[in-house]
């Protein structure tokens, strides 16, 4: 069946379950990816818990130091492969989505593989140096990559923007205009890079929106657009 991969934020977060999965490291919120509704529409939903996230102890979290997009990417794709092997996931109808670090991983994944037919990245990082310099909390990257002038190669090698030319998956980028945690500059840079290369990409900017959208009408529109995006690119017929 068509399968959507939901990647949690963090990276040190995780997923709880209910009508809407919540990021464990952020206050309760309406998630932009209504997975219960998506499941009702005929999608299988994979909630991977890759290394770097909650539940693996210090060693598991340190596995992604100077290595974002490496062991975590392998873990996510191993989960996809398992569902395909079990006959649950149709390998020709895969989608990937996530916000914050989940958005970063979504951006990263579409630069590394063409297996997904559609992707949606919310409040996502594309240029790690930008995040360090422009985010109100960018100093957290020091724990993973040191400072940009101390590790230029590491920042570039783990930034999706560096590999924008590799993207073949249609990508929807959603971002709050006033996001203080992951400034919108990165979304614009990734969008313009992909657009300049003729890639299939759309950018939705939510006025007044922060790292998490708080206005009910914007929350509803964000969910609606995600449902619409995956329906457009992934056929849900059994």
PLM features: residue spans?
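Active-site-proximal cap/loop segments of hydrolase catalytic domains
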Residues: 6, 22-238
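Serine-hydrolase catalytic-loop signature spanning alpha/beta hydrolases and amidase-signature enzymes
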Residues: 11-13, 45
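Short beta-strand element of the alpha/beta-hydrolase
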Residues: 1-10
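A flexible loop/linker signature enriched in serine peptidases of the S9 family
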Residues: 16-17
């Amino acid at each position: 069946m068509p399968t959507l991969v939901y990647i949690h934020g963090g990276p040190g977060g995780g997923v709880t379950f209910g009508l809407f999965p919540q990021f464990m490291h952020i206050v309760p919120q309406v998630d932009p990816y209504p997975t219960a509704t998506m499941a009702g529409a005929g999608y299988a939903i994979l909630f991977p818990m890759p290394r770097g996230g909650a539940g693996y102890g210090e060693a598991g979290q340190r596995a992604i130091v100077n290595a974002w997009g490496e062991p975590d990417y392998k873990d996510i794709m191993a989960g996809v492969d398992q569902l395909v092997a079990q006959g649950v996931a149709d390998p020709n109808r895969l989608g990937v989505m996530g916000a914050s670090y989940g958005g970063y991983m979504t951006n990263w994944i579409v630069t590394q593989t063409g297996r997904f037919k559609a992707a949606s990245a919310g409040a996502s990082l594309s240029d790690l140096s930008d995040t360090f310099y422009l985010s109100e909390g960018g100093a957290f990257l020091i724990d993973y990559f040191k400072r940009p002038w101390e590790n230029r190669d590491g920042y570039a090698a783990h930034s999706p923007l560096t590999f924008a030319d590799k993207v073949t998956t249609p990508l929807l980028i959603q971002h709050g205009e006033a996001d203080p945690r992951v400034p919108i500059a990165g979304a614009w840079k990734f969008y313009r890079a992909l657009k300049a290369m003729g890639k299939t990409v759309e950018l939705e900017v939510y006025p007044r929106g922060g790292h998490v959208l708080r206005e009910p009408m914007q929350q509803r529109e964000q969910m609606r657009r995600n449902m619409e995006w995956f329906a457009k690119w992934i056929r849900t017929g059994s």
